[in-house]
Amino acid sequence: MTRRILVVDDMPYLRDIQVLLLNDAGYATTAVGSAREALERLSDLAPDLILLDVSMPGMDGCQFLARLRAAPEWQRLPVILTTGRSVEDVARENRCDVLPKPFSEAALLDLVERLIGSASSGGS
């Protein structure tokens, strides 16, 4: 079964790059432009992992993550926060994996594979 990833980023060109890299690696990827849209579509999409921008207008990535972790069915869902801020600060505040921007294709795919396995694996 192909692993599903939800990309949440308000910058269209960054979303497109992330989707391209993940799709090329064999993952089934859906992208949305806001945390609110991600919350609305989460149950239907049932992702195996979320790649989440920290800095977005409206509800930011950290607020989204807090809501996600408050829901029992999503507490264990792997999340990678992407940020231009201090990685240590973001990781400490949110207790999850953080990928600093700009990031390389190798860094993205290595972290995704570490968390959920290869695109067609049953997990890590």
Predicted regions and their residues:
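Active-site beta3 strand of CheY-like receiver
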Residues: 45-51
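Receiver (REC) domain active-site loop signature in two-component systems and cognate sites
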Residues: 56
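Helix N-cap/capping motif at the beta->alpha junctions
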Residues: 31-40, 61
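Two-component/phosphorelay signaling modules centered on CheY-like receiver
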Residues: 12-30
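C-terminal output helix
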Residues: 103-115
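Short amphipathic alpha-helix used as the core "switch/output" element in two-component signaling
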Residues: 40, 62-75
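Active-site residues of response regulator receiver
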Residues: 53, 83
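The C-terminal output helix
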Residues: 113-124
